[in-house]
């Protein structure tokens, strides 16, 4: 906490996740880099998807990875692949897009980007990441919410109040993928 800034919240996170079906994932985020990189990568048995720099790259494998692993005899052998690049929408409104969709749902009945239950899943995952860090061990979802609250309150109790703080308001236009606030 406060790895890169004088704050008491996480500003540098790396999380490893494992799902019931055996799938794994890595989530990395930081505020300690000069220019962030948004990258989403999904590795599957027969292909890989990468979303980065306003494009989706689909790398299809000529042979499934699971089959290749069993049959390959070359040292450092690699699967033959072919790529398909797909341009994606240049405007990525991120947070402001979610807020605008929420307002549109209230005002005009237009669809949400995701229902509230999906947002709750994100909060649960974030809280699990924090609890794992608080305890210094892996945690499973669902986790003990009372334990999470107890651990969180320990941190609240030792929080350092900053003296002589001045409120600052910033123009955040352009920070959400070019979307206007």
Where are these regions (language model features)?
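Generic detector of contiguous secondary-structure segments
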Residues: 36-39, 43-45, 126-127
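Short, hydrophobic/amphipathic alpha-helical packing segments
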Residues: 99, 123-126
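Short arginine-rich
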Residues: 125-135
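Loop/helix-junction capping segments adjacent to catalytic residues or to phosphate/diphosphate-binding pockets
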Residues: 36, 113, 123
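Rossmann-like dinucleotide-binding domain that binds NAD(P)(H)
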Residues: 1-24, 29-35, 41, 117
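Short secondary-structure junction motifs
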Residues: 37, 136-138
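C-terminal glycine/acidic-rich active-site capping loop/insertion
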Residues: 5-6, 14, 19, 44-117, ...
């Amino acid at each position: 906490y406060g790895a890169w800034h004088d704050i008491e919240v996480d500003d540098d996170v790396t999380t490893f996740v494992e799902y019931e079906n055996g799938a794994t994932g890595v989530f990395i985020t930081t505020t300690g880099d000069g220019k962030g990189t948004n990258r989403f990568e999904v590795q599957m048995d027969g292909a890989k998807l990468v979303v980065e720099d306003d494009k989706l790259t689909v790398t299809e494998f000529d042979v499934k990875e699971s089959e290749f692993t069993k049959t390959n005899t070359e040292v450092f052998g690699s699967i033959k692949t072919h790529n398909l690049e797909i341009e994606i929408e240049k405007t990525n409104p991120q947070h402001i897009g979610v807020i605008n969709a929420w307002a549109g749902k209230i005002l005009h009945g237009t669809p949400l980007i995701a229902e509230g239950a999906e947002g709750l899943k994100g909060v649960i995952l974030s809280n699990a990441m924090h609890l794992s860090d608080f305890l210094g061990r892996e945690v499973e979802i669902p986790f003990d919410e009372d334990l999470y609250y107890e651990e969180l309150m320990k941190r609240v109790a030792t929080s350092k109040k900053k003296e002589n703080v001045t409120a600052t308001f910033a123009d955040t236009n352009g920070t959400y993928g070019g979307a206007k606030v």
